[in-house]
Amino acid sequence: MKKNVLIIFVLFITTQLSAQLTYKDVAPIFYKNCTSCHNEFGHGMPFMNYTQTSNYATSIEIALNENEMPPWSPDSSYTRFTHERYISKTEKDMILDWISGGATKGDTTKAPVPPVYTKYHINATPDLELTIPTFTSNASNDDSYVCFSLPTGLTQDRIVKAFEIVAGNPAIVHHVIVNVDTLGTTTDDLSGKCYQITGDFSLGGFAPGAPPTIFPSRAPLKMGIRIKKSSKIVLQVHYPAGSVGEKDNTKIRIYFYPVGTTGIRPVVV
C-alpha cells in the first residue's frame, strides 16, 4: 500500500512540475540549441521570443520526437566532433513537457535576455570579400547546381585563417561548396548542371546553420590554407527545385594571416 501511495505521489509531483513549466524555463534551451539558425538573419523561422516559438509548438514537438532537430546525424557513441548540435535528453524532455502542458507563457520578463545575432558571424572587416553576380535561380522542376568562378586578385600567396560564407538569399540557398582554382582558368557554369565543381582543392562549404570556419591562429598551434596568387575561388551553389525566379548574391568573406607569418601548419580539406 505504501509503495502504491509513493508511486502516485511521484506521478502527481511530476505532473505538477510539467504543468508549471513556462517559457522562461525553456527559453535558455532554445537559445542554446536553436536560435543560431532560428533568428531573423538565419535560414529557419525565428524562435527569439515566446510568440515566435509557441506559434510553432506542434512542429517543434514533431521535429524533436523524430530527432530531426537539431539537425545532427552522427552517433556520439562512436566519435565526437567540433560544433556538434546534440540536445540532451533532459533538455529535450523539458521542451516536450512544456509543449504538452500547453506551451504556457508565464512571466516572460523572467526569461533570460535573448542572444544578439547579426548578418555576419565574424564582424571584423574581411581581407577579401567575393560576391557572386546577382543570379536568378533557374531551378524550376529540378534542383540547380550553379558554379561561379571568382578571381581573387591576389598578387602574392596568402594563408587563410578564417572564412565565412553568407547566403545572399537564405530562403533558396540549400548549400555551398567552395574550391580553389590555383591556375585561375575556370569559368562560370550557370547551366544549373554544374554537378562536378572544378578547382584544385577544397576550401570548405556551407549549409544552413553552419558557423564560420576559423582555424587556430595563435601559438603553439597556428593552422591555415594557402591560396596562391592569381587563384580563383569557385562557389558551387545548390538551389532547390521551385526556387526559379528568386534572386541570390551569395558571398564569401576571407581573413588572412599577415604576410610573413611563420609556423603555420597547412590544412588539407
Residues of each region from the PLM?
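Bacterial Sec-dependent N-terminal signal peptides
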Residues: M1-D25
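Aromatic- and Gly/Pro-enriched helix-to-coil junctions and flexible linker segments
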Residues: Q20-F148, K232-Q236
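Histidine-centered active-site/metal-ligand motif
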Residues: H38, P170-H175, H238-P240
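Solvent-exposed, flexible loop/coil segments flanking beta-strands in beta-rich domains
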Residues: P112-I172, S243-V269
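Noncatalytic modules at the cell exterior or secretory-pathway interfaces
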Residues: V160-F163, G224-A241
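Extended low-complexity, serine/threonine- and proline-enriched intrinsically disordered segments
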Residues: N169-S191
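Exoplasmic/lumenal beta-rich domain surfaces
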Residues: T185-G204
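Beta-sandwich interaction modules
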Residues: D200-K232
